[in-house]
């Protein structure tokens, strides 16, 4: 199985936000939200010296994505196909899943409930509910521009990066550019509590990587809190649906 991933080279990133702007333009992302973001970190003192860098973030398309297990949508059987070999596999999935052939995490907007459970479950804050999609909104996030890569194009953020700081490819291919960065020491953003295998990695000076790791610690919402959020949102949808049906009956 391939595992698509991305390297962010912090030695090259200039914090211009062109990647985030390109993503918004490509996917019509609301102004207040972002599939991609760039945050300034520092200057701050670390154990490795004074550091100042940027945190370009996006969905990590994790090995064991917390968002997938959090989705409450009824599962259905779906057929997945490998772009290269043509091999097929049938899996039962909810409204979000990890593709068995390319390792990306995707969303079925038609079946998404808009409850936001997946967004709450993501330890990286990489998901949000887009209020412009459907009556109740739909979950949205970076897809690694799967529609673009399917026809041989790079993700919009990679193509637009002025400094060449974003590198996209197959991490499972030892000869790929992304795999070479891993060999050189590109790191994952994880923590003692969160080890779900993010497939976006960061490369740079040791002090900058230290600042990044200390500033951007992934956190998983406690299950009890997640359940409360989910139940509250689902209850809101049920009440709204009931009111709508009552009005239809009244005027029907």
Where are these regions (language model features)?
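Non-ligating segments of multi-cofactor redox enzymes
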Residues: 1-252
């Amino acid at each position: 199985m391939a595992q698509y991933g991305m390297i962010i080279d912090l030695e090259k990133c200039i914090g211009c936000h062109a990647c985030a702007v390109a993503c918004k333009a490509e996917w019509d992302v609301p102004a207040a939200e972002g599939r991609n973001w760039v945050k300034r970190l520092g200057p701050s003192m670390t154990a490795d010296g004074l550091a100042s860098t940027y945190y370009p973030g996006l969905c990590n398309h994790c090995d064991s994505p917390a968002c997938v297990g959090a989705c409450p949508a009824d599962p259905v059987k779906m057929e997945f196909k490998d772009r290269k070999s043509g091999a097929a596999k049938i899996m039962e999935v909810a409204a979000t899943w990890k593709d068995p052939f390319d390792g990306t995490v995707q969303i079925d907007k038609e079946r998404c409930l808009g409850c936001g459970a997946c967004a709450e479950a993501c330890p990286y804050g990489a998901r949000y509910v887009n209020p412009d999609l459907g009556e109740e909104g739909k979950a949205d996030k970076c897809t690694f521009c799967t529609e673009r890569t399917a026809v041989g194009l790079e993700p919009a953020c990679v193509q637009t990066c002025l400094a060449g700081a974003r590198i996209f490819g197959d991490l499972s291919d030892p000869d790929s550019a992304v795999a070479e960065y891993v060999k050189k020491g590109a790191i994952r953003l994880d923590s003692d509590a969160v080890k779900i295998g993010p497939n976006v990695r960061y490369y740079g000076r040791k002090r900058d990587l230290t600042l990044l790791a200390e500033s951007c610690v992934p956190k998983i919402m406690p299950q009890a809190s997640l359940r409360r959020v989910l139940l509250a949102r689902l209850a809101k949808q049920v009440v709204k649906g009931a009111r709508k049906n009552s009005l239809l009956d009244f005027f029907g």
